[in-house]
Design a protein with these regions (language model features):
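Long, charged, low-complexity, helical-prone intrinsically disordered regions
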Residues: 1-508
């Protein structure tokens, strides 16, 4: 009835009486309904919709302003005519706008970092080839990584179809160098990669110089001779047991004093055979872990950089790796002087407009510095969590045990070489203990997480899981999912073979 009385339209016959009743102010009723169901609008909008004059509609809206409190003003950033808006609509819009603004400025939960870092660092990305491997090394400069996981788990997860020859080529071209950062037992150690051009500003001084007789002699010979093969060093140091000299070289490697022009010695680390007593064999070949040319790391720090240059280079490197740099991240990196030492440089970068300072991640301290674009990426991960990702527990992109605390698990998790984490939806779902025998769960891992876990077999050759959360894997809640992911029964649990040796589960 209101359409008939206000607009003069003919109604179809047969309508119920309730639908044809008019009102005292039919145009006002139509405008009131329009205002309640629309965002701010100019008078021309309902006039155009109903084929009425703007003057008549404007008069009706002004009557509603007096009777219903309809609001008139500039509500939209269009620069056009002023608009009309129902007060309830405006209150609703303000509530939604405030909620959106709060979500834009509120810190993300700390767990979001676990999904953000792999995406930020390009894990499982599309990088390929020599030049993009060099980019990856640039992002990893100074990160301390176990030698046993460096290529298999860290470089291999960032560069598709990674081959060791790629790193060898970059080293032989003088583009990349590696430096030892401490032993891990008798068959492994921590190393850091650097771009050769950045080494003078990033390679740290060794904490202490080793003072054993062989260490001192090696240091003198390398300083005098420059880069040298093992046989030349062995002869210059007076001969003797080649294994003793090799051990002394590696002592100096892990102390950050000596490096090599190849990554091959790193690949040949592992448990050493027991020495036998008796006559020493004649040395015809250098011990495998002594191949390549050895040189002093001190040469990489030339030309010498000033302390300020070193701090600026380190700050830029850490920001590039983490995107959002926090006190906890700096602590996990083992930076001398900690966050306080970098703070003046970070403040200067903020004042220059190169970084933003704010409280971006909940629970990680009030002073956080972020690169442009990193905060938007961080919030995008919060709003749309990524799929399943497999990481070495020691990967710089693995936040757990560094910036993010471990969730409650049925066993002890640690950033140990040979252990793996599986993230799903940006949250930790699986922790595979070193050696692969024990699996710990957080929440309910889905098929995508178990499929990611199965790829460990391709890296290590064979993955045999014996327990889940301390209980036998056979008969556990994960048994069916593991079978679906390709695992089959073994005498001790469930097994999956990697690569060409992969076996389908029984009954598949």
């Amino acid at each position: 009835g209101r359409y008939r009385d206000a607009l003069g339209v003919a109604l179809p016959t047969g309508l119920a009486a309730a639908h044809v009743e008019g009102g005292a102010d039919p145009l006002g009723d139509l405008l009131r309904r329009h205002a309640r169901t629309h965002v701010p609008f100019p008078a021309a909008e309902p006039a155009r919709r109903w084929g009425l004059g703007v003057v008549a509609v404007d008069a009706g809206l002004r009557r509603l302003a007096r009777t219903d409190g309809l609001l008139h003003g500039s509500f939209l950033a269009t620069g056009g005519a002023s608009e009309w808006c129902h007060p309830e609509v405006l209150r609703s819009l303000r509530r939604r706008s405030l909620a959106a603004l709060r979500r834009q400025v509120e810190p993300v939960p700390v767990e979001t970092m676990s999904g953000f870092l792999p995406a930020w660092q390009g894990v499982d990305g599309g990088r390929r080839g020599l030049e993009q491997l060099l980019e990856v090394v640039g992002g990893l400069q100074g990160a301390v990584i176990p030698a046993s996981t460096l290529e298999r788990d860290v470089l291999g997860s960032r560069v598709r179809d990674y081959q060791p020859r790629l790193l060898d080529e970059l080293i032989s071209l003088g583009e990349v160098v590696w430096v030892g950062r401490g032993p891990l037992g008798s068959g492994d150690g921590r190393v850091a990669l650097y771009r050769r051009d950045d080494a003078p500003r990033l390679v740290p001084e060794p904490a202490d110089l080793l003072d054993g007789p062989l260490h001192t002699r090696l240091r003198e010979e390398l300083a005098r001779r420059g880069a040298s093969f093992f046989h030349d060093l062995h002869r210059a140091c007076g001969g003797g047991d080649p294994e003793e000299l090799t051990d002394a070289l590696w002592d100096m490697v892990w102390a950050g004093e000596v490096t090599n022009d190849s990554a091959a010695p790193l690949r040949l680390l592992g448990p050493r055979p027991r020495r036998t007593t008796g006559r020493r064999p004649l040395m015809r070949l250098a011990p495998p872990r002594a191949q390549g040319r050895w040189s002093l790391v001190a040469g990489l720090r030339e030309p010498a950089a000033s302390p300020t240059e070193r701090l600026h280079a380190l700050s830029a490197t850490l920001l590039g790796r983490h995107g959002v740099l926090t006190r906890e991240a700096v602590l996990a990196e083992g930076v001398p002087g900690g966050f306080a030492g970098l703070y003046p440089v970070l403040r200067a970068m903020e004042e220059a407009g190169r970084v933003r300072r704010g409280y971006f991640v909940d629970g990680l301290g009030a002073s956080q510095f972020a690169l442009p674009g990193a905060v938007d990426r961080l919030r995008a991960v919060r709003d749309e969590p990524p799929g399943a990702v497999l990481l070495s527990a020691t990967d710089p992109a693995s936040a757990h045990g560094a910036t993010v605390p471990w969730p409650q698990l049925a066993g002890r998790a640690a950033r140990a070489a040979g252990a793996y984490v599986v993230l799903e939806g940006g949250r930790l779902r699986l922790f595979l203990e070193r050696g692969g025998r024990g699996l710990l769960t957080a929440g309910e891992p889905g098929p995508e997480a178990l499929a990611a876990l199965a790829t460990v077999a391709d890296r290590v050759g064979k993955l045999e899981i014996v327990t889940v959360d301390g209980e036998p894997v056979r008969g556990s809640a994960l048994e069916a999912g593991l079978r679906q992911a390709g695992f089959g029964p073994s005498p001790r649990g469930m097994v999956l073979w990697g690569g060409a040796g992969r076996r389908l589960p029984v009954g598949a």
